[in-house]
């Protein structure tokens, strides 16, 4: 297995390396079967939207969560309570509750889909680091971020695999898109976290009116939380790309490209000409169910539907 390691640019003589800043990644790529992908406990999956944009999905098993984190436990409790309250509100037969749900849903659909991508990337402190055993390299040891930081220079980190469809995407394109995602995410979500927190005090007078729920306050609190989560996801993604201690390996996922081809084979020549000059929408209503089934990521259905809706509207505006 070929590892992606940090090497100072001056020491690189091989041509089969891809540079990202001061890091170098091997471009001697390995192919991965669908079964290997499905059994990978933690991975990054690149889901092309157009030939220029992709949805970056960080997926991991639940046993990789840092169960010792009090913050994570508290957050989980709050999220469960909030979700229960939201479900109750959605089921309410009262007309004003239905209007509130419709308004909030409309606002949520207007947030950039890149936010949903970053929300799949947990805070780095929430995930246990996987390292190789000192004597037995086939053994996997899991450490909290705090313990890993102390030992990082003396241990070998288990690789994080990045799966993509060959022919549609490539390692350099994946890196470009991930870099753009975290750079824009850090700026955008830091700014909107601040805006939401500044707006919260303005909703306090509504608390004094018992018959009217403080919907703006609840919404701004939720949006502040989401923006913080997305910001931390962007920070984690930056660490994965820039830290020499991280170990990224790119994998061509066998059969992945063919899934896209099956979904786009019905496109007519006229439609192709009509969209000339604009990025082709590779992720659409036909390819979506095929991708969800192939990758077994049905939990992303609402997120990817949001992507299709926003990108379709964007293309329609560009045609005018």
Swiss-Prot record:
PANTHER family tied to this protein: K+-H+ EXCHANGE-LIKE PROTEIN, TRANSMEMBRANE PROTEIN
Superkingdom to which the source organism belongs: Eukaryota
InterPro entries in UniProt: Mit_KHE1 (IPR018786)
Pfam families, per the entry: Mit_KHE1
Species this chain originates from: Saccharomyces cerevisiae (strain ATCC 204508 / S288c)
Protein's name in the database: Uncharacterized protein YDL183C
GO biological process: potassium ion transport; proton transmembrane transport
Family membership noted in the UniProt record: To S.pombe SpAC23H3.12c.
Any one annotated GO CC term: mitochondrial inner membrane
